Amino acid sequence: MQTRIEVGILGATGMVGQHFIKFLQGHPWFDLTWLGASDRSAGKKYGDAMTWHLGVVPETVAGLTVSECKPGNAPRLVFSAMDASVATEIERAFAQAGHIVVSNSRNHRMESDVPLLVPEINPDHLKLIPGQQRARGWKGQIITNPNCSTIVLTMALGPLKQFGITKIIATTLQAVSGAGYPGVASMDIVGNVVPFIGNEEEKMQQETQKILGDFRGSHIEPLAAKVSAHCNRVAVVDGHTVTVSVEFSAKPSEADLLHAIQSFRGVPQDRQLPSAPPNPVIYMHEANRPQPRKDAERERGMAAFVGRLRPCPVLDYKFVALGHNTIRGAAGAAVLNAELMHSEGMLD
């Protein structure tokens, strides 16, 4: 029987932390035994330290005592749901103390020695870790998952990289849950579209180039494609939709692209990792799909859905992509990253 691995969560009382807790319930490999939060929550029982927003708080964690977000009694593997305002120093302190930090926070994503991981797309980027440890003089490590909308975009584009992507134009329709809790004021979003999400467009553009880039022995060579993103907040609860136009150097046919999407599998599928969907990218042939309400929670929220593939009069082809922003776009992504690391022997 496989030895179970104790894990902790940094920022456990916030919305992202709660999604981590929910996703880890019943995990076949990981036991959630430690919860870290702010000083005002430390020392309290978890059930008394936060307001739970996802149904009923799991009994397995309600009685756990919340700790300060400091290395010491935390398990070696910690998931970070820290707010960006405090994540940088806390995550570094844990890595310096020998912890493996799998982070959902944005703070370290674009650092050259930190993997920005989508396990089906760029698992070889984990090879950055030895260089990270040497350069920073620590035995721990920091691994990040991308912005929630970037994950949807790169999962859809990953199978198509073989055709030589040269230009990408992406427009997002992003769910309100992506803004956290309490999120966007109802008077701002009901019956409305907000055509601005702070720093989101820059993150999508830069992160996409890094994720789809190639590992070159000691560094990542970013994808040499021009990427333009426009991000909008819409009155949808869960599920980010991205409309995408792409130009290719190889000039594939529509049939080539469709075959690449439908046949695509990655390392998580080959190794049957617990949180990996059997088909990471699912093509939907219906003219009006994918849709957040109908599709975002399929495959436990861990797949990306693509539809409406057709020629583009400006670039080469265009399509629609969809993914669950708080599952595959956040907690589920980080847990799958840790599963990949375990399958590589990096948690031993």
Task: Explain the meaning of each model-derived region.
Residues S177-D348:
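Charged docking surfaces used in two-component/phosphorelay signaling
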